[in-house]
Amino acid sequence: MRRDDLVRSGVSQITATFHGDQEVFTIRQLLEAAVSHSDNTAADVLLNLVGGPPTVTAFLRDHGIRNMRVDRGEREIAREFQGRSGLHALSSEETPQQKDARLQRGYAAYLKDPRDRTTPDAAAHFLKKLWQGQLLSPPSTRLLLDLLYHQTIPDRLLAGIPPGVRLADKCGTSYTLDGMTAAFNDIGILTWPDGHTVIVAAFLTASHAPDERRRALFKRIAQVVVSDLHP
């Protein structure tokens, strides 16, 4: 990886440990960073390695997954959020008022953009196929599920899961602007000791709820699922 591969949005272990003009990371390190730690830099590097967004979307279609599409990497999505799409550089003379207006435009543009979208049903369908071994080879399936079991955001669905039930999940979060959070998501596979499995896809969009209420909502979703759908 080169320094210009770094994505300056979100939390990135890769960025934090990067020194000099280039660093070498294994595919396993990038996968762990992207899946378990939601590292945007790692996600973009992996996306480019497999052939870019069209390759990923084609893979989904080839495996019968509709209404899920990947059009851009995290860097491009961050530029849209920041109102920088089409801009090569920000003006050094930008005023606080101009910056606020730019961010507002970017946030509104992201919410209206049809690209890089999925539905809860499509996300659940993806997880079902993954769980059933219909997407990847057996070793790759085991690896991805293990990375999902070790994702590091504890206060969404995982907060409502009792001892003995395992959760392999992936969270997604946008930043918050003026009290609105564009995306606050968690999708996962719950598994009981006897093998009983339930798939959950929970998406919260354009929410004005404070962070503690959003986290409490996802905890409650998991509690209801466990209570009503246990074996």
At which residue positions do the language-model features occur?
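Active-site-adjacent loops and short helices of periplasmic peptidoglycan-processing enzymes
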Residues: M1-E76, E80-Q82
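Conserved catalytic core of the tyrosine transesterase superfamily
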Residues: R2, G83-L87, I221
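Flexible glycine/proline-enriched surface loops and loop-helix/loop-strand junctions
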Residues: T26-L30, H37-A43, L103-L111, K129, ...
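Generic detector of well-ordered alpha-helical segments enriched in charged/polar residues
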Residues: R28-E32, L47, T57, Q104, ...
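Structured C-terminal helix/loop/strand segments within mature extracytoplasmic catalytic/sensor domains
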Residues: P53, A108, K112-P120, A124-R166, ...
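Short alpha-helix boundary/capping motifs
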Residues: D62, E74-R75, L87-A89, Q151, ...
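Active-site-proximal helix/loop microenvironment
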Residues: N67-P139
